[in-house]
């Protein structure tokens, strides 16, 4: 007599249980935060966000410079449409 997929179902149930336990641990229990105080985590996260914002600002400036380079330098004005 075989039991079918009982082993697979038990494995899935155990993985779900472990994932729920990991969620409940909070920020200090996560792998990336192990051994760090709350202040250290906040400083690390602030540094990461600062770097991301600097990259975004540089990208925005580069796009603005490219748009300005492609823009027409002399605007044509039709005096009859003024």
From Swiss-Prot:
Q: What is this protein called?
A: Modifier of protein aggregation 4
Where is the protein found, in the record's own terms? Cytoplasm, Cytosol; Nucleus
Highest taxon in the source lineage: Eukaryota
Q: What happens when the gene is disrupted?
A: Suppresses protein aggregation and toxicity caused by protein aggregates.
Q: Report the record's Gene Ontology biological process terms.
A: protein destabilization
GO CC annotation terms, alphabetical: cytosol; nucleus
- Bias kind Basic and acidic residues: ranges: 1-23
Keyword Transit peptide assigned to the entry: answer is no
Gene from which this protein is expressed: moag-4
User: What job does this protein perform?
Assistant: Positive regulator of protein aggregation and age-related proteotoxicity. Induces conformational changes in aggregation-prone proteins, driving them into compact formations preceding the formation of aggregates.
Q: Where is this region: Disordered?
A: 1-41, 63-82
Q: Which family does the similarity line name?
A: Belongs to the SERF family.
Which key words tag this protein in UniProt? Answer: Cytoplasm, Nucleus
Task: Name the species this protein comes from.
Answer: Caenorhabditis elegans
């Amino acid at each position: 007599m075989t039991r079918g997929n009982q082993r697979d179902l038990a494995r899935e149930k155990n993985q779900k249980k472990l994932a729920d336990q990991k969620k409940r641990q909070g920020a200090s229990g996560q792998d990336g935060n192990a051994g760090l105080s709350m202040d250290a985590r906040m400083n690390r996260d602030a540094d990461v966000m600062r770097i991301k914002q600097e990259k975004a600002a540089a990208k925005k400036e580069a796009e603005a410079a490219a748009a300005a380079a492609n823009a027409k330098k002399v605007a044509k004005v039709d005096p009859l449409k003024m």
